[in-house]
Amino acid sequence: MLPALAWGAVPAPTEPAGPPTPASRPAPERERTHGNGVYHTLLGNLSINAPQDTLGGAEYDAAQSLFEAGLFDSAAAEFGRFAARFPRNLFLNDAIEHVLLIRENREPGDEALRLYAHAVALRGAGLPDSAASVAETGLSRFPTARIRYHWQYLLAEIARERGDHGTAIRYALVIADSTSKSRLAPYALKLAGDESIAMGEDPAKALRLYQALLERYPASPLAPPVRARVLEIRKRL
């Protein structure tokens, strides 16, 4: 769960009432244009239950385009306005995460943040290999940058999509380490657990990862589906 924001007008991130379910109709246009947002991807394809869930798609697209172009001040302002105007939109958490990401990683030249934005743009354009190369460059050049966990999560997701379960788990476990204090840690724990199952490892390993998520992040929006999966695994053991 994202921490409370200090900038007033934007509402707190919403959480789904239960496990995510597959979308019952085609994805919004912005997903086909830019790819899923960070938190929308992490939470899975939530059901679209009302027009408010997708209202504001053009505004989100505009903010995302500014971010990918490296216009971070403008992007943060647009994401903030989007979050304030469209609190029901499924990309709300993603917009808030962008604002936090920009605020936490501004520095002279914004080189590390620009590399991340470029990697995101490449992945959204359907160029995962190029995106991975940029993320790896970022990790090599800025190994201690705060944004390194976002590069690593991007690499974990790309590895998962390739079917490279071991690499996906390796990156995810770095993020999930309790010392990282990354907002992506609960999502990394779930990814590592899912990939452990996908590669046919002992279910007890995935169970330990899922239980760690539930113990460390009980209020996470991932908790309900993970809790259900834990029950399923325990029945089979």
Report the location of each language-model feature.
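Bacterial N-terminal signal peptides
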Residues: 1-6
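Acidic, polar-rich low-complexity tracts and alpha-helical solenoid repeat scaffolds
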Residues: 7-237
